[in-house]
Every structure is written in C-alpha cells, then in structure tokens.
C-alpha cells in the first residue's frame, strides 16, 4: 500500500507492496520529520518540547518469522534540551508512553495507567496481541499464548525447572 512518490523520494524501484516502495516511504518520512523539526526549532517553545515518534504496528510482511523482529516498532523521543541522545534495546509497549511523558514533563499528582516509564532502569516487558494470540516479550524470553495453552516460546536461558516459562505465562495471562 505504498503510493509512488516523486523525485527525490523515489530512490528505489517502486512497487505498491514491495520493499522498494517501503524504502521510498521511509526516505520521504525521514525528510518530512526533519522538515517539521527544523521549522519547529524557530518557535519559542522548542526548548521545552518533547517529540515522540513511533508506529502503531510493524510491517510484518517484510519481517522474518522471528517474533522479536515481527513486533518491533521504533520509538524516537527527541527533546535536545531535556534528554541526552542514546539508544536502548529496552522492551516497551504503547501503554508505556503516557507514564513516560508524565515523568519527562515532571508532572505531579496521581494517575492510573498499566504502563511504566521507559526511562526507568527496569528492563521492562511488552505484551502484544496478534489476533486471538497474546505475546509477551521480556529479557527472559518470548512466549505466545492462546489463553488456553502456550503456542510458541523462545527463552533466553535454559529453564530446567520451568520457572521462567511459568513466570512469563503468569504475567502474560494476568496482563490480558
């Protein structure tokens, strides 16, 4: 579903559902975000602004069968006067955006959310629905569940006692 772009954005052979169309769309998106931020820099409130850029889903048909690659979406938090540039491989979900924003804005008061601040040292986890299946991603591994049984799993360490798998399953079912 990628429209053909005009030069200079049509850098790769176009196809409405090909990798070339996807790469052209990324090239255009990168340019558009850069233009937006450059124009925003002229505003008085730029130094106090937090930009959060993310996607609502991964582009699964260009990904491998690796569940980590299939569900990974980028999150860019840009606030040059507030946050030092860095990258993170931390697990998170869109439910974590609100608590992260609240922390970055240093807001006081109480709020209710199921997410957590992504800038806290905790490595986190992400729960992702995939049709009737629910997935959990953590540093301990990945688990996919039908809410009746485990469908797939990839643990990062041997788990002879089954305690890691049981813990992931319990967390996933409690979250759903």
Regions found by a protein language model. Give the residues of each.
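Solvent-exposed soluble domains appended to multi-pass membrane proteins
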Residues: 1-176
